[in-house]
């Protein structure tokens, strides 16, 4: 499970010449955008605080013209590798061994969870493909992002007050499909994919750790699908400098995402989601004030 993370840590600690090369061939703003995108995406992807909202806000703060799609794809790939590496044993059971039981008479928890993850993924796959096919652009209006952050933070707050009795082995088709419907709201910038999935699971009575784990498992098909759709938009680009950026963002986002997952799961044993609710609301208010004055 730790093989990739140790390999990547060794790469970044001892391969300083690559950083020197990057600094030499890139201007400061480009290098800054790479670092910020990697760190923000890695830290925020699996927390209920919206990675897209943070990236857009930082874009406004630094007056960058737009979010570099290539960097976003690389960052998503990094976080995808982080969650699959961290939960490698679970991924083998649920995504590799689980589907093989489809022809078996005796179904285990592995197959049931795989099936429920599949059910949860259907709504956003269909809706996301629909938007992509008809070339419907997402609405990235700054006010919408701030307002959705506040609204979905409050929903998380109220869901966290719910009684918690269910564990992952209690999940039903109805539960998984409801979580899948909620995940469609993740297409609204500022809502947070992790946040809406956790909110739905908490409303359904799952404890915090199980809600977060299910959200992280569900991120694997969700991020894979989103990255697959975006990948074709950048595949035709062929540049040495571009690939240096892609590799750097991938490794950095992997590292930050991996350690964020570990820290988040340990932290949840001691606290509830109120910290994240307050943080998101304060950031949204600051964002609204910033938009008014600047």
Predicted feature residues:
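Multi-pass membrane proteins that catalyze or facilitate reactions on polyprenyl-/lipid-phosphate substrates
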Residues: 3-294
């Amino acid at each position: 499970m730790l093989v990739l993370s140790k390999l990547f840590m060794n790469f970044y600690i001892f391969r300083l010449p690559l950083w020197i090369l990057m600094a030499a061939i890139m201007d400061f703003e480009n290098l800054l955008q790479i670092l910020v995108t990697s760190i923000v995406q890695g830290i925020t992807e699996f927390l209920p605080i919206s990675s897209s909202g943070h990236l857009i806000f930082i874009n406004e703060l630094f007056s960058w013209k737009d979010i570099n799609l290539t960097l976003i794809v690389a960052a998503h790939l990094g976080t995808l590798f982080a969650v699959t590496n961290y939960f490698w044993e679970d991924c083998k059971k649920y995504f590799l061994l689980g589907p093989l039981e489809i022809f078996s008479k005796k179904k285990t928890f592995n197959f049931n969870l795989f099936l429920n993850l599949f059910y949860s993924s259907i709504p956003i796959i269909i809706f996301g493909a629909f938007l992509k096919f008809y070339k419907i652009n997402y609405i990235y209006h700054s006010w919408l992002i701030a307002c959705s952050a506040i609204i979905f933070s409050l929903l998380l707050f109220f869901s966290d007050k719910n009684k918690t009795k269910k564990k992952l082995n209690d999940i039903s088709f109805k539960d998984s499909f409801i979580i899948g419907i909620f995940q469609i709201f993740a297409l609204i910038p500022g809502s947070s994919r992790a946040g809406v999935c956790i909110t739905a699971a908490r409303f359904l009575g799952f404890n915090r750790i199980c809600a977060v784990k299910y959200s992280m498992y569900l991120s694997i098909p969700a991020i894979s699908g989103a990255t697959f759709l975006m990948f074709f938009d950048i595949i035709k680009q062929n540049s040495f400098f571009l690939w240096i950026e892609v590799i750097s963002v991938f490794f950095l986002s992997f590292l930050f995402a991996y350690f964020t997952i570990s820290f988040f799961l340990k932290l949840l044993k001691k606290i509830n989601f109120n910290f994240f609710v307050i943080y998101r609301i304060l950031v949204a208010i600051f964002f609204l004030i910033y938009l008014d004055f600047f």
